[in-house]
Amino acid sequence: MNIRDLLNQRVLAAMATCGVPADLPALIAPGKKAGFGDYQANGAMGAAKAMGTNPRDLAGKIVAALDLEGIADKLEIAGPGFINIYLKPAWLGKQIALAQTDARLAVPQAEHAQTVVIDYSGPNLAKEMHVGHLRSTIIGDSLARLLEFLGHQVIRQNHVGDWGTQFGMLIAELEEQLGAKGDAALELKDLEVFYQQAKKHFDDDAAFADKARDYVVRLQGGDAQMLKLWQQFKDISLHHSSEIYQQLNVTLTDADVRGESFYNDDLAPLVKALQDQGLAVESEGAQVVFLPELADKDGNPSPVIIQKQGGGFLYATTDLAALRYRVNTLNAKRIMYFIDARQSLHMQQVFTISRKAGFVSDAVSLEHLAFGTMMGSDGKPFKTRTGGTVKLAELLSEAVDRAASVVSEKNPELAGEDIAEIARKVGIGAVKYADLCKTRTNDYVFSWESMLSFEGNTAPYLQYAYTRVQSIFRKAGVAPETLGSPILLGSEQEKALAIKLLQFSEVLDQMAREAMPHLLCTYLYDIASLYMSFYEACPILKEGVDAEVRDSRLRLCHLVARTIAQGLGLLGIEVMERM
């Protein structure tokens, strides 16, 4: 059930009856304040302006033509022509009953399913994942989960950095450390240390540096020994990433990896295609595409090097090849890139070239979904105390440890294994939610204290709200699926909660459209807050509560729990029965 869509259809039909042109919107939105309707239709003002008529008069005609029999209690015109719509509690109760028994919580699947490619995470395999990878990984994953839930075919693409000149240095170092034999996994147990050793060796030893450069040429030429060492390095690095994904409860698998190396064979043909079209031209020995569309303030076109003077290719070349593959082979109709805001110009260049070259038609949506930076309490990018990058594995481990302290303090009687499992869900959930609940494009300050709080818009607060509902059912001794009584919405709290529950589909649609997970977080927090108000005002298991009223309230409770669990699940956050 999508109330907004239903009202939109009905109001548009009424507007058409009143002679309003079909391209003018009904502008349906939930009521913002008490006393201004459960929903508002705000299209009369714009329509009246376009038609040269009085907005209140037009609103009156729309109301007269509006068929909401059995759905709305009351329609009223406010201000210059707002139409306030008050929904019938009996109708809302029926919709709640349908949602409560529906496997999908009455969320319809998308009418026009698409193939959506989502490019996210993308760590460099030469280094361990750090906090800078967190945002792309969890924001991208939440959209992948959501779009699949809505019925789209989602193809995850983990565009890892597995190619480039640094691999000559790393392979040479690995070969020397392995000697005649040895365990590569053991040598690479700390990728960060290994990378630093290789870099120092490269900087300090000219002979080693020459060997590293030679190894790059051999690797790029397909030398079997170089490829074998490179593959070992790649496998072990990917295993590190895979462990992080499992810890984070992220859906990326090895099958989703499409490293830069995957596109190697297409780079030269791609450059030739751009040359043949006159888009790529020689400039100082390099092949460059000049884009007047992205000119600087002095009118100089934006230069994009796609092949260096020595014949080497660049990130832009690989990204263009990846884009061509995603459109031609994967048949993507929407391609979403969850990449740092600092790559904004680069992505604009890639998108512009791909359109001009005809690699991508106008029917394909290309979206760079940039995000802000995680900051420390000093207002600078989040670092260790010594100023180094924070490893993601260490951050997640600390989150679980801190959550274990909080959980054991609140519930000292819990068994050790229960504390460990709850702490894992609370700690990882807290880190993810603290990020996802912020507007994607904004920077935010990382704070252990606020993210692990059981108050406010946090994962622990929502997880706790879920467990409270579960405890009510244990106390009542009732299985939710046995409840079949009508839903009675006799109080303001019950009605407010019911309307919010029925807006789940609207919120998911908006999040899918705008790629903004904070919209879902805000919605879930609103649900939990309205539930707490309902719980305080509407007794459920107290003596003297009528059986039909009790069962109706239990059904509302059940839908609250399922909505929180489903919503958090789409964010990749787990719930627990007890806390």
UniProtKB/Swiss-Prot annotation:
It is found in: Cytoplasm. CDD domains: Anticodon_Ia_Arg, ArgRS_core. Signal peptide: none annotated. One of its GO terms (biological process) is arginyl-tRNA aminoacylation. Coiled coil: none annotated. It catalyses: tRNA(Arg) + L-arginine + ATP = L-arginyl-tRNA(Arg) + AMP + diphosphate. It comes from the Bacteria. Its EC number is 6.1.1.19. PANTHER family: ARGININE--TRNA LIGASE, CYTOPLASMIC, ARGINYL-TRNA SYNTHETASE. NCBIfam families: argS. Monomer. This is Arginine--tRNA ligase. It comes from Cellvibrio japonicus (strain Ueda107). The gene is argS.
